[in-house]
Amino acid sequence: MLSGLQAFFDHSRHTLSVRNIEARLDVLAFEGHEHLSQPFTYRVEFTSTERDLAAETLLGQDARFSLHAAPQKPPASGFSAPAVKPLRTLHGVVTGFKRQSGSNDQARYELTLQPRLALLGQGRQFRIYQHQSVPQIVESILRSRHDFEGQDFLFSLKRDYPRREQVMQYGESDLAFIDRLLADVGIWYRFTSDERLGIDVVEFCDDQRLYQFDIALPYRPQSGLGSSGQDAVWHLQSNHRVVEQQVHIRAYHPRDAGAHLSGEIDQSRGASGTYGEAYHYAEPYTTLGDRLDQDEDLLSESGYFYARLRHERYLNAQTQLSGITSSATLAPGQVLHTTGGAPQAFTPGAVITGLTTTAARDSSLVATFQAIPYSDTVCFRPALQPKPQIAGTVPARVTSPQANDPYGHIDLEGRY
């Protein structure tokens, strides 16, 4: 089947450009890794007649990598070929660069392309955020410390999130801190492109209604036949396992010792393949919420809110889907619908959660994807990240809202 694909996908058509680099960069091969709630990473091998590109001219520079379809048949004599738009373009920055070899004619290089958000993984911070919600904290970090502007990110959220009294960042990079906060409340993110501005955009979402649904590909098992120039999927697999049937939560509110903060939730709606109870104690909530409320009607960061998120994570692992495609436009966050007798597990639609794409001048584009079945009641949730541990003595300073105040003041609860 791959031999058939080579006829309609010409890898010499892929283009790579880096800001302030005028030399032509000819793509030799590439490998890309994408996943929901993770910065993508594309490693692109290329050749250039510039035999000694300086690393300082590439690292940190904006770059663009475009995937093109095979060229159309040449036009009749006297007519120019129409401009062909790329199938997909990835915008980002160069975070890695390597010179592999060289000759008298050209040199071979490799660069790593990632979104600007990946740069937040450098460094670590110790900070306190007060009276801000999780989206507000994320936005303040992006804007104030990393010069993101309104066109660089988008919050597509179905629910409102309460302000937290205090949140601490302790010895974490800004990316690790953001990932930990977002995972805690079930917010996931993906990357899109603004072709008008030529930038990558990170989009934050919290509901399955925010998936992209207009993706359909035929299922064509490998049989040695050509694909007639049409993208398809094959080698579809499904992996099933028993997961927790319900989640039981309990917490203690020190300011209201008599508060009822115990409950249980079952998001499987009686589906088979579940067993057992997962007991979660001391989740960060002070209000239980209403068990019968659905979607955004359920109080954010309440007990049942956290219980549903925890159970959704268990249910995400119940069925894992995978497959291979020749499509260059498939991306995480899309719901793939397959036609042509695909396995039953793919019938509801496959939510693409991860993607590994490879191609070279001598091999066709192949994208191996991971997915979960689409559900109206269960959404993809990023894995919880461990909180940093504070050990030993931590020196600090008692402060006051008044400038040069000689005294430290306490509130009604005895806190500075």
Predicted regions and their residues:
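Amphipathic alpha-helical and helix-coil boundary elements used as assembly
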Residues: 1-416
